[in-house]
């Protein structure tokens, strides 16, 4: 399957099966994240794998959006490691987003579904999992196999065309915008 097909087929899973994700697949997903480019190649990502019953019960105190997944990745970055620039203060958030996207696509290729979840309680995550203060927690990513009731949201295929989201040479509006006619 092409990367474009993976992107088109992947959807945010909100109905997971309790079936465990095999260690080999989990390792492949994590390895894909390690391939992600990061600003100045600093690699500030710090991924916590949450999968034991007690740890998942702790996760349920930190988000209501685990959706029954047997694995949850905490996506964070070390603020002392992330690249810095005077005009751009948060390269780490972009870095961890790219890492998360790489892992999400690798999971999809392996038949493992995922969901990017930003509805989290970072202070509670810190308390429950001993996350250092120097780590900025950006999101969690539940991983697992889809349940029999799994379906993409009705909004999944509703995408604005590039003619509405891509501009050439300026962000001017109207007929002179230079937007694609796709």
What kind of region is each of these model predictions?
Residues 1-182:
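Acidic, surface-exposed loops and disordered segments
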């Amino acid at each position: 399957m092409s990367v474009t097909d993976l992107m088109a087929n992947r959807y945010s899973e909100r109905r997971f099966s309790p079936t465990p994700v095999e260690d080999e697949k989990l390792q492949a997903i994590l390895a894909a994240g390690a391939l992600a480019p990061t600003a100045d190649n600093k690699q500030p990502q710090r991924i916590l794998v949450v999968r034991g019953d007690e740890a998942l019960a702790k996760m349920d105190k930190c988000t209501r959006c685990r959706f029954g997944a047997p694995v949850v990745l905490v996506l964070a970055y070390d603020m002392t490691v992330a690249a810095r620039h005077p005009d751009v203060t948060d390269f780490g958030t972009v870095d961890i987003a790219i890492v998360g996207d790489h892992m999400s696509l690798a999971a999809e290729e392996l038949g493992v579904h995922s969901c990017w979840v930003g509805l989290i309680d970072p202070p509670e995550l810190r308390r429950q999992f001993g996350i250092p203060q120097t780590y900025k927690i950006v999101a969690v990513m539940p991983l697992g196999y889809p349940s029999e009731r799994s379906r993409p949201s009705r909004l999944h295929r509703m995408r604005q065309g590039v003619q509405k989201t891509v501009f050439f040479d300026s962000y001017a509006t109207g007929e002179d915008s230079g937007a694609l006619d796709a």
